[in-house]
Regions:
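ATP/nucleoside-binding phosphotransfer catalytic cores, i.e., glycine-rich phosphate-binding loops
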Residues: 71-166
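Accessory alpha-helical/coil subdomains and C-terminal extensions
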Residues: 2-68, 155-166
Length: 166
């Protein structure tokens, strides 16, 4: 079979093998729009956090670099994660080619102590938003664990994921 690849300046970045359809195609029509995207910037204030946690089912955190929460909001963020354990928190990054890696900085280690979160790895922010809205809106129909569903490859939205191997 033929293989596709993504090229960058003539260099092959990734092979994308063709995958035959193995099951019947299902269509899902529900989306959970109670998803909030918060972009981390240096000096961000914690004032908005309580309202976000109170009003949204999922908080997607777009950090700078490969992952982290600015110190200015870290304590408040961790407390809210513990106060609202049913909220889905997804850590994303603006450097999708590098992917998120919450083990790089101390704040990532702290987050793992205080918060239950999913990590976007090499997923684009658009893929994360669409997937979370789909997952939460169709939770019953999809069955299973949200973490397993999130990390399941859907149309190559996550290629490297947890194993980070090319």
């Amino acid at each position: 079979g033929s293989e596709m690849c993504i090229r960058d300046s003539g260099n092959i970045m990734r092979y994308i093998p063709p995958v035959p359809y193995e099951e019947e195609v299902w269509f899902y029509e529900e989306l959970d729009e109670n998803v909030y995207l918060i972009k981390m910037i240096p000096g961000i204030k914690p004032r908005i956090l309580r309202s976000v946690f109170e009003n949204y089912d999922c908080i997607i955190v777009e950090s700078f670099g490969v992952g982290g929460i600015p110190q200015s909001i870290a304590d408040d963020f961790y407390k809210l994660c513990q106060e609202f354990p049913d909220r889905l928190v997804v850590m994303s990054t603006q450097v999708a080619h590098e992917g998120s890696d919450m083990t790089v900085y101390e704040v990532g280690h702290d987050m793992k102590k205080y918060c239950r979160f999913l990590e976007s790895y090499d997923m684009t922010l658009e893929s994360v938003i669409a997937k979370v809205m789909w997952m939460l809106g169709n939770r019953e129909a999809l069955g299973g664990n949200l973490e397993d569903i999130f990390y399941q490859n859907v149309n190559y939205d996550v290629i490297f994921g947890k194993n980070r191997k090319c």
